[in-house]
């Protein structure tokens, strides 16, 4: 038996409950993984919150999409993107629907080796945010020597995007709240406080102009400023401003004509693992909660200023 978190109905974090259920025996192309840590992402509560539609048939809804752990059982022909999988392998899993669980059976195609340089908590928070960061950097085509502005640079996606870009020789300017400016600076970016006067502070930090933008905040101010700074809206990408697609900016994660980036995201783990091995990226874990505290984790993350990744410990 495994413990897992489900949403009993659509609503806020109060609809979550911790239950016990059997763990399916892995079939062909599947493995079972014992969770060591579980990544928490805004999409987790948006799904049971109804932001992406409501289907009563989906209830009770398993929650979560990524985890790190140890392979405990292997089905026939279970081969991940890095090769055949074996019992005892230390892995990162994404996508892993229902990841808020002590043990989970998943497609082998979702399972990648855990970089030994990362803790369980760090590995649990790497793949979804990291895939989004790689996806965003790829669609705007930012390259060495260019200047990149990241709105919301202190969050899980923003911090990873900043580190990856810096490792690739890109100059990064990142907006953040006052309490998170040092965290952004720590990873080689120029930190700029958001709020009144943001336009002037960004122009001062980038006297030569801004070539591309990643928006992780979704605010109207962020998109309006980005359109003012960057002549080509196709070099602006947002992971939240889904209602601004008519401006010509690129969207990932939702909205009309969003870029799915299926191949980019599926292959992103290789770049992320390589950068982790080289010491070029870290996963900043802002806070951990127990599996039973998933609702509290969601309330904290929904406040909008986590300062890194939120992780559950089974």
Language-model segments: which ranges?
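Short, well-ordered loop/turn sites that connect or cap secondary structure elements
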Residues: 85-86, 142, 230
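Glycine-rich beta-strand-centered segment in the early N-terminal region that forms part
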Residues: 22-39, 51-97
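NAD(P)H dinucleotide-binding glycine-rich loop of Rossmann-like/cofactor-binding domains
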Residues: 65, 78, 90-152
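Glycine-rich phosphate-binding loop and adjacent beta-alpha segment
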Residues: 220-281, 314
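Short amphipathic alpha-helix with an adjacent loop that forms part of the alpha/beta core around
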Residues: 198-208
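C-terminal hydrophobic helical "lid"/dimerization subdomain
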Residues: 270-314
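Mid-domain Rossmann-like dinucleotide-binding core that forms the NAD(H)/NADP(H) cofactor-binding site
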Residues: 130-195
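Short glycine/proline-centered loop/turn elements that form peptide/ligand docking sites
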Residues: 75, 80-84, 174-183, 220-221
């Amino acid at each position: 038996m495994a413990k897992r978190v489900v949403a009993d109905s659509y609503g806020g974090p109060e609809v979550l409950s911790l239950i016990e259920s059997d763990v399916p025996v892995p079939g062909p192309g599947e493995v079972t993984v014992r969770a060591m840590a579980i990544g928490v992402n805004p999409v987790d509560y948006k799904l049971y919150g109804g932001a992406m539609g409501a289907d009563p048939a989906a209830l009770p809804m398993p929650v979560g999409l990524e985890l790190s752990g140890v392979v405990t059982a292997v089905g026939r022909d279970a081969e991940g993107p890095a090769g055949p999988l074996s019992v005892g392998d230390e892995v990162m899993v994404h996508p892993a629907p229902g990841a808020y669980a002590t043990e989970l059976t998943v497609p082998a195609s979702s399972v990648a080796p855990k970089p030994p340089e990362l803790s369980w908590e760090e590995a649990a928070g790497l793949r979804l945010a990291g895939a989004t960061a790689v996806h965003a950097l790829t669609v705007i085509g930012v390259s060495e020597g260019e200047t990149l502005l990241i709105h919301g640079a202190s969050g899980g996606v923003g911090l990873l995007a900043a580190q990856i870009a810096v490792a690739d020789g890109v100059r990064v300017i990142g907006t953040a709240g006052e309490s998170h400016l040092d965290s952004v600076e720590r990873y080689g970016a120029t930190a700029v406080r958001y709020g009144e006067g943001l336009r002037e502070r960004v122009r001062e930090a980038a006297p030569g102009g801004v070539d591309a933008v990643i928006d992780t905040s979704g605010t109207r101010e962020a998109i309006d400023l980005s359109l003012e700074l960057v002549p080509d809206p196709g070099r602006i990408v947002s992971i939240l401003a889904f209602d601004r697609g008519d401006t010509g900016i690129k969207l990932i994660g939702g909205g009309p004509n969003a870029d799915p980036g299926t191949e980019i995201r599926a292959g992103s783990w290789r770049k992320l693992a390589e950068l982790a091995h080289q010491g070029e990226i870290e996963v900043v874990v802002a806070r951990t909660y127990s599996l039973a505290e998933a609702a509290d984790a969601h309330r904290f993350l929904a406040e909008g200023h986590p300062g890194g990744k939120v992780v559950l410990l089974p």
